[in-house]
Amino acid sequence: MIHFNRLFSGRFRVRLLLMILLVSICSNGNIFAGGQDRAGTAAAPELRIPVGGQYLALNGSAVAYASGLEAIYWNPAGVYLNNSNASAIFSFREYIADMNMSYVAVSGNFGDFGTLAVSFRNLNVGDINVTTIQQPDGTGEIISPTYFVLGFTYSRVLSDRISIGANFNFINESWGGVSANGFSVDAGVQYRDLFTPGLSLGVVVKNLGGAMKYDGSALFIQADDPSSGRGNTFYQVAAASFELPSEFSLGLSYTKALNEENLLSFSGAFVNNNFAYDDYKFGLEYAYNNILFLRGGYLFSPQSSDDRPNIFQNYTLGLGLNLREFSDIDVSLDYAFVPVEFFNNNHTFSIRVNF
């Protein structure tokens, strides 16, 4: 007789999970292909815009120990780590060129079953005046593009050290009479107290899914094909399809308690990007009495000529404040500063509430 409890022991489940991740990576053969030579050609670039102020201040290096609702973006394996019955977060990021990114998510803890979460990301690019060759100053028409990602997350504990998580995302882009829909999956693992207490390992693959393709009435044009004999008629322009910006991240972190009031957390991550330079990220967080948090991060890309992969500068800064000690509500405020070249600097604000 098969003993299912033994069959699905902790070690077996870890091996099975790692096997699934490897199969997922291998089945998406292009995940490690290309790089910077394909920058700007991916579908759904909004998938790569970080949200939340807590871990953005660490430059995204906290793959191994990200927890709570901000972990949805960085590593869904950490979503369960919030020791509360329910949680909510709202985040707002001032992006480049008058664009901004809003993020809201809620989660519920269902005991041994795990944690379920729903998230919504919206990239607001503002209104765009329509221009043509004949009317370069504008036709008077205004289009308002919409870009959003609706996500469903599942996270649970496999043992006292191991957690897993996955995001299932619906992607929608719509503007000027055309639209495109897509689906993507993120999957991650976190392993705590690896070899020694405080040392954690995190692995995550993100944005796995099929290509996206635009469709809609704006792709129809009027033309006259003399060979058809049909006169002036409508023809549909064949839109190209574009791959999602897949990436793979491997991270380590180490947390050290200096005393009862002071805590230091070091984090680092390697990120292999399908449509950009590979990144090395490092972060440092200082926590005082679990009330005040000071954060900083640094990123460099050896493949880039100046160690910087894009218009964003190498470093990030931020701070956090936990108001639980001063009120009856478990509320945390976070801020992240991202310096930018050519555009205004990015400011990200977020508020987290636990119930």
Question: Model regions: which residues?
Answer:
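N-terminal secretory signal peptides that target proteins for export/translocation
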Residues: M1-F12
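Charged, low-complexity surface segments at secondary-structure and domain boundaries
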Residues: H3, M19-L21, A43-A44
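A compositional/structural signature marking long, glycine- and acidic/polar-rich segments
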Residues: R11-R15, N290
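Bacterial N-terminal signal peptides
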Residues: L17-N28
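Subset of outer-membrane beta-barrel
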Residues: N30-F355
